[in-house]
Structure formats: C-alpha cells, structure tokens
Amino acid sequence: MDYTLTRIDPNGENDRYPLQKQEIVTDPLEQEINKSVYMGKLEHALHDMVNWGRKNSIWPYNFGLSCCYVEMVTSFTAVHDVARFGAEVLRASPRQADLMVVAGTCFTKMAPVIQRLYDQMLEPKWVISMGACANSGGMYDIYSVVQGVDKFIPVDVYIPGCPPRPEAYMQALMLLQESIGKERRPLSWVVGDQGVYRANMQSERERKRGERIAVTNLRTPDEI
C-alpha cells in the first residue's frame, strides 16, 4: 500500500478535510422564533432528547499510537470508572465507533491510516487529541512527525500534557458531552434544517482566567 500525505490549503479547493465549509454563525435556535409555538417547542425537545442519548453513549474506537494510550485505558479501570460517562464500550471497528481518541505521536506514515479510519466512521463522529504529541508534535519537531493531527482531521477537544493523566481524559469527555449537548444536527433527511451547528465552546484557559488571577495565596514549589 502506498501512503501519501498532502498538506491542506485552507484557501484552496479540497475534496477532503474540511469536508464542508465551516463558519461562525448566530445561534441556530433563533430561527425557532419564526415557527409556531407548538412546532418550535417540539423540535427543541426532540433535539434535546437526541443529544442526551448521543452524549451519554459515546463509543470510542480502540486504538493507540504511543504512551498516551496507556493513560487512556487506565481510565477504564475500576479506580476511575469511565463507564459513569457512558464511554466504556470500546469498538474494534471504526464503523461501529463515533469517537476517535488520537493518543500519542502521529508519524507521517501513520497519518494516512488515521485519515482512512476517520473516513470509515459514520456520522455523527468526534475526535479527541490526547497529549502534546497529538496536539502539536510535542518535542518531536522533526520531519517524520506530523505537527498536530488537526492538520488532516478536525479535532473537537484537545488534552494537554505529556502524557495527560486519566483524569484529564475524563474531563475531556465531559467537555465533549457538553459540546454534543449544544449541537444541532438534522433530525431526518427531510425534516428541518440540514446543516450541522456546533457550539463555539470557550477554552478552559479563558474560562478559568478570572479564577486564576484572583488567587492570592500561592503554593510553595515543594508542594504537590
């Protein structure tokens, strides 16, 4: 099998990622104002029920690239019990999964394989980039390592760390669940708007900025 890795031109035409034009729009719920009270409330309730089922039954695809995968599977142990979030059903096939966790270093030879696995996943699907290597290449600023998996697939949640702790992975699942709960996808092929709307989530750094600035008592360097 021949592997190729093509750099994406954000301003050019590309039949792969991004698979559709992405732009920031106003809240899609505002269009419900123009509908009748009954149909607007009914469609809003249907979206909430569908998103509740999706966010509480996330099936991750079982594969790993490097040491971050060890931290990922640690969250499945009884100590952390990721089953509380409905994400314990590991799938051996991408066609049965809706979450891909890129855990570890993404080498240039592995990038086309990850791209193909992502294409085989059915919608709706989400991606978590776990660890510094998956986010930006980490300390491997060399020709053989892709400097971030978001160069060729869309990423929903980034987990910093080298490697991140299992608690960080579980927090990423909670953030992903929050994002899924605010999504608006077509209820069917013929009913409602056919566009996919994803909430513009605030980064954790920005969300906690005020709380961190307000801290007056700092811990000493020898404390954990």
UniProtKB/Swiss-Prot annotation:
It catalyses: a quinone + NADH + 5 H(+)(in) = a quinol + NAD(+) + 4 H(+)(out). Transmembrane segments: none annotated. It comes from Citrobacter koseri (strain ATCC BAA-895 / CDC 4225-83 / SGSC4696). It is a peripheral membrane protein. It is found in: Cell inner membrane. HAMAP family: NDH1_NuoB. GO terms for molecular function: 4 iron, 4 sulfur cluster binding; iron ion binding; NADH dehydrogenase (ubiquinone) activity; NADH:ubiquinone reductase (non-electrogenic) activity; quinone binding. Its main location: membrane. Its EC number is 7.1.1.-. Its cofactor is [4Fe-4S] cluster. InterPro entries: NADH_UbQ_OxRdtase-like_20kDa, NADH_UQ_OxRdtase_20Kd_su. This is NADH-quinone oxidoreductase subunit B. Binds 1 [4Fe-4S] cluster. Belongs to the complex I 20 kDa subunit family. NDH-1 is composed of 13 different subunits. Subunits NuoB, CD, E, F, and G constitute the peripheral sector of the complex. The lineage of its organism: Bacteria, Pseudomonadati, Pseudomonadota, Gammaproteobacteria, Enterobacterales. It is an enzyme of class 7 (translocase). Signal peptide: none annotated.
